[in-house]
Structure formats: structure tokens, C-alpha cells
Amino acid sequence: MSEKILKYPGSKGNIVSDLIQLLPVHKVYLEPYFGSGTLFFCKEPAAIETINDMDSDIVNLFKVIRDAPVSLANSLIATPYSREVYDNSYEYRENESDVQKAVKFLTKCWQGYGSRGCASKVGFKTDISKREKMYAV
């Protein structure tokens, strides 16, 4: 599996191998609580797959990854790692595109720390050792 793009509360990353062994052979797969999608992306594909999440930021992010990956990547490359950008990522505007919303969501997740679900503002990451991962999309 490639580098995950989203650290998210409740991620199954540490136990995904065990969970995959417990999955029965299946033709239909439903993931009602998608989150970071760790299990979905690690398991074998099924003929019919449905994913969902109550968090509209998660749903929007993965729609943008599916529908406009180049636009998202270009926007992320142009996004500076700064406290100002991080603070502004919590301000949503009505006329923002789905790509802009996805960039803001990832900015909160990547540049912040201690935020539950990347939704509540706790703090800005000042360490630079992992900063380059933000630009690895």
C-alpha cells in the first residue's frame, strides 16, 4: 500500500491485516463509516462497492480525489505550510469549489495536531521533520 494521505481518528491502519483476514469472500462490500478508507483500500476489490461517511469533508475529499486529482494535487503543491494558511483553513466560504474545500480539509489534517477529525482547531504543527509529506501527493 502506498503512503496514506489522511490520518483520521479511528483509522484501522494498525489492525488492517487482522481485519482483512476476518472478511468473508464477498461480491458486495458496504463501508458506512469510511473515514480514511484504510480497510477499503487494503482489501481485495469486490464487484459492487459502496462507501459513505457522515462527515461531508471526508465525502468531498474522496470525490475530489476521484474526479479532479490533478487539480487537487496542483492546489496542494501551491499551498504554503504556514500558520496563516492553517488558520484560514477553518473559514469556509459559500462559493468555494469542492477542490478548495478538500485543500482546506487536508490543510487542517496535515498542518494541525490534536484535532479530532480535523474539525476542531487545537494547534499548528511547528515541527518541520514531516512537513515534506504534505507535498507528496
List the model feature ranges, each with a label.
Residues 17:
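Active-site phosphate/pyrophosphate- and oxyanion-stabilizing loops and adjacent acidic/basic residues
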Residues 21-91:
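SAM cofactor-binding core of SAM-dependent methyltransferases
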Residues 1-14, 22-23, 69-137:
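SAM-dependent nucleic-acid methyltransferase catalytic core
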